[in-house]
């Protein structure tokens, strides 16, 4: 449940910043970089309110050695989940990059309107966070597969959309599934990895997320060699997401 609330808080911030970027466009594209100033607010709040006990820096050598030991099966589990997280984040970032151009190409709206669509896509993550506890109870280990496939379908709906409202519907479906899928990755880690090893395992999953975001421009460039059509780009991304979800879920089932 706390993982769900964390996901909700994340998307609130992301949607507010996306909306702010859309409004800052009126002052020129360079003004949009002011959105990064929000990081300074986060830093100040972190320094003021997050407790840091000095005793934590003096952990026993025994605990440190124990925390360093991840078994082969654990490493495989973490690797598969990190790959899944990388593709989830990569495709989501690609959507953020490509929805504005797709809407302009299709005549559905301009860059400012696309920022509203992206904000709606992210705000639905609040509902995803609230409902995560129920969904994980209902689908259990199949939730990653269900959410990943749904995320891919959302992207394909965007690609085939005949109107703005269908783009909005596909974006909302994709945004909901994205939040659920990414939260499920960390839930599976916390469920299957011992508490003393959880920090290390989580750091690998976060590395997967960061890798996915950083690889997005290269992935889009690679797709650009295949097609320059915006709709086809979303179909490729959606298919990739579905295939990855099926593969990762299959590998996780074998490891269970």
Stretch-by-stretch model annotation:
Residues 1, 180-193:
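Intracellular juxtamembrane helix-capping segments at the cytosolic ends
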Residues 128-140, 224:
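Helix-to-loop junctions at the C-terminal end of transmembrane segments
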Residues 48-70:
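Flexible cytoplasmic inter-helical loops of multi-pass small-molecule transporters
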Residues 143-157:
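Structural signature of the two symmetry-related core transmembrane helices
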Residues 1-9:
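Cytoplasmic helix-loop-helix junction between adjacent transmembrane helices
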Residues 195-227:
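A late C-terminal transmembrane helix in Major Facilitator Superfamily
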Residues 77-118:
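Extracytoplasmic gate region of multi-pass secondary transporters
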Residues 33-48, 233-249:
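Symmetry-related core transmembrane helices of the 12-TM Major Facilitator Superfamily/SLC fold
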